[in-house]
Amino acid sequence: MSSVLMSKTVTPFLREHIPSIYAPIGKPGNQETARAENPNSKYCYRHHPDSKCRRAADKAKMVMIQSELDKLTSADQQAVTHVWSLFSAAPARHRDLMLQGILSQLCFPQLSFVSREVNEALKIDFISALPVELAQKVLCYLDTVSLTKAAQVSQRWRTLADSDAVWVRMCEQHVNRKCTKCGWGLPLLERKKLRNYTRQRQLAKGGPQGRVTELADSHDSQDRSVNQHGKRPAAEAEEEDPIKKRQCMAAAEASKAVTQPKTRSWKAVYRDRWQVSYNWKNSRYKLSVLKGHENGVTCLQLDDNILATGSYDTTIKIWNIETEECIRTLVGHTAGIRALQFDDSKLISGSLDHTIKVWNWHTGECLSTFAAHTDSVISVHFDGHLLASGSSDKTVKIFDFNSKETYCLKGHSDWVNSTHVDIKSRTVFSASDDTTIKLWDLDTRQVIRTYEGHVGHVQQVLILPPEYEPDEEVLNGASQDNQDAMSVSSGGSGSPSMSHAQIERAGSPGSHSSSHNLLPSSLPSGDEDVRHLYGSAFVADESRPLPPRYFMTGGLDSTMRLWDSATGRCLRTLFGHLEGVWSLAGDTIRVISGANDGMVKTWEPRSGKCDATYTGHCGPVTCVGLSDSLMASGSEDGTIRLHSFKPCRQ
């Protein structure tokens, strides 16, 4: 192309369009008119100088292009450069026209080359380009593996992927619950750390006599020498020596600096819990065997760093889990210990000597003894100011520590092996050798419902947390089975509906429930329907909390059963143990069971799947305990096996 021809064709084109490219300010007048007359007077979103999608030129590619261009003759270099200049200066409509013409002339190898180049050019960093709030919203949909990979892309991605706004959502979805999407559930550790901190503060304050009278929330209590405003009385402050006063202030500041909790990111919170959950899922644990009892271990309770065990040797031992040492032995019963429970200040035990004792487990002192039963005490459970005990005399005794009242609940025809008080709803669950479980109303002292289904002695009743919800397929399957049963019993009418009067009778005190006489699961959808199922006492007082909805039981028929306390339905039966189930423990994430076959099993409570089986005991496993990162089991072989799922660094 001659210079004359070039000046006649290329120069006018560039003269017309280049100013709008390098000075895209827009023409005066109406904005829409200016945009229509000057379509390239505004930057596109990709080439706008402020756009985060705009990438710097690829240095390697530019060097390669320059190298290839240098290989051409001067005329060819000028021609190629003019093509680039024309395309660069062309408006959007002209560019589209140029590209269509060029693409229509390309052969397949050239089309493949264009496809590869376009594929790379279309990739933009949309996370960095989006506003922070939208980018975090997008990242909230990723799982943990994808999030950790996203944090490795760039510093910008790492800042967004590690932000608290993303990981707090992840914690809400997994901590203290089972995620319905991925199946992972993470333990709630902070509550236990708070208790440990409270206990350490109590130990540092003074002797054990003062600790007995403190409540579980004693970390909120104030020093007696400090008034409501956090100040000492003026007279007392004036009497203090100035030097001593400065020393006290310095010590207080140092103590405050040490004890003040550090702020942690939500990602770190999630990581700590994920490590514990990973160890549970893969059965990675540290095993400790505690020996000290001279006979079989019958009961235990695990709480943070303290383990309490009872035995047929008539003693109760208090263990320090970290040091694996017995720090105290409680002696006073004259026969084997069958049940115990403790909190921060007291321990209550039930024995074969027909008595219940209240201990100060910090000192080993027996504070009081109750001789309310006429036979062996098999179970004890307290909640607040109420204590329930079950005995081989076939009765349940209720002790009210506030009113000093004691009364008896009669209805079982055999030993009462397990009791559980729910102080909010003022109800008690009891399990018996007569193969039934009963729900009692403490206001009327009558049976609300009797649950039938086990064919062997029922040894344990485990109340599931309020957050627990069974799988929908469990509810749907149970509902379908129940509807079929009702259709048959109604002469094939096919109508599963029940009248209001039937609901009243089904929820009345003393009613029986079994797998063949159940209420449809579609009924208790609202609070009013559920209240009718628990009887007239709950209907009359709408402010009264309802009893726990779901619970599990273990029996000597080698099965565990999941129950709906409102309908009386057995929702699921868990099989796996070869011999009778003696003990259960659980939380929102897992349930563990100990049986006469010497095995401990962990279960997923929603699906009913057995996650793992632990062996090692040389006798029946009579008791189990569970915390977020620990599992304890006691056996008639006289040992306690402690499984710690804490990360090694802890």
Curated annotation (Swiss-Prot):
Key words of the record: Repeat, Transcription, Transcription regulation, Ubl conjugation pathway, WD repeat
Pfam families, per database record: F-box-like (PF12937), WD40 (PF00400)
Region entry Disordered, spans: 200-244, 482-525
Biased composition (Basic and acidic residues): 214-223
Superkingdom per UniProt: Eukaryota
InterPro entries, alphabetized: F-box-like_dom_sf, F-box_dom, G-protein_beta_WD-40_rep, Quinoprotein_ADH-like_sf, SCF_subunit_WD-repeat, WD40/YVTN_repeat-like_dom_sf, WD40_repeat_CS, WD40_rpt
Taxonomic placement: Eukaryota, Fungi, Dikarya, Ascomycota, Pezizomycotina
PROSITE patterns documented for this protein: FBOX, WD_REPEATS_1, WD_REPEATS_2, WD_REPEATS_REGION
Segments of skewed composition (Low complexity): 487-499, 507-525
Subunit structure of this chain's protein: Component of the SCF(scon-2) E3 ubiquitin ligase complex.
Name of this protein: Probable E3 ubiquitin ligase complex SCF subunit scon-2
SUPFAM superfamilies named among the record's database cross-references: F-box domain, Quinoprotein alcohol dehydrogenase-like
Induction comment from the UniProt entry of this chain: Expressed only under low-sulfur conditions and expression is under the control of the cys-3 transcriptional activator.
Functional description taken from the UniProt entry: Component of the SCF(scon-2) E3 ubiquitin ligase complex involved in the regulation of sulfur metabolite repression, probably by mediating the inactivation or degradation of the metR transcription factor.
Alphabetical list of PANTHER family matching this protein: UBIQUITIN LIGASE SPECIFICITY FACTOR/HREP PROTEIN, UBIQUITIN-BINDING SDF UBIQUITIN LIGASE COMPLEX SUBUNIT
Gene3D superfamilies: 1.20.1280.50, YVTN repeat-like/Quinoprotein amine dehydrogenase
Domain F-box: 124-170
